[in-house]
């Protein structure tokens, strides 16, 4: 999932190829948007943008690994899983760097870097190269009224 999911997928892929000698997998980038980085709702329905070259992609029999930075309410992940399911893969697995443990929909991550049960207004910022200079996870607490 673009944006920060893509470099995470690259890191994960490189490690799997190195450790297990797997062939380089096909990469399918999906642009998904529902929330801004500050958790402001941008779109009432999750928007998914498909790259034209992937429209006719046949995933039958494949295992697909979806990689994203933060699992929040599950709306974006559900939209991605619905899209991929129409391409009939054998299995869809999900990896995320941070699970906020606040999903509202019947989706989950199979592989999670960190589960952080935090207050709803708090924000998880994932710093992922090349978008940021260093790799880290930060908890941002907006100013609360006194």
Task: Go through each PLM region and give its residues.
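PRPP-associated nucleotide enzymes
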Residues: 1-146
């Amino acid at each position: 999932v673009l944006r920060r999911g893509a470099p995470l997928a690259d890191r994960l892929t490189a490690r799997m190829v190195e450790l297990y000698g797997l062939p380089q997998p096909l990469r399918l980038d999906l642009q998904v948007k529902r929330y801004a980085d500050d958790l402001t709702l941008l779109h009432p329905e999750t928007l998914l943008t498909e790259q034209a070259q992937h429209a006719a992609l046949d995933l039958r029999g494949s295992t697909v690994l979806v990689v994203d930075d933060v699992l929040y309410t599950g709306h974006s992940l559900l939209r991605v899983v619905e899209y991929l399911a129409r391409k009939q893969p054998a299995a869809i697995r999900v990896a995320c760097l941070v699970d906020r443990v606040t999903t509202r929909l019947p989706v989950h991550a199979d592989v999670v870097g960190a589960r952080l049960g935090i207050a709803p207004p708090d924000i998880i910022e994932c710093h992922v190269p090349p978008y940021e200079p260093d790799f880290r996870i930060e908890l941002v607490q907006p100013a609360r009224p006194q």
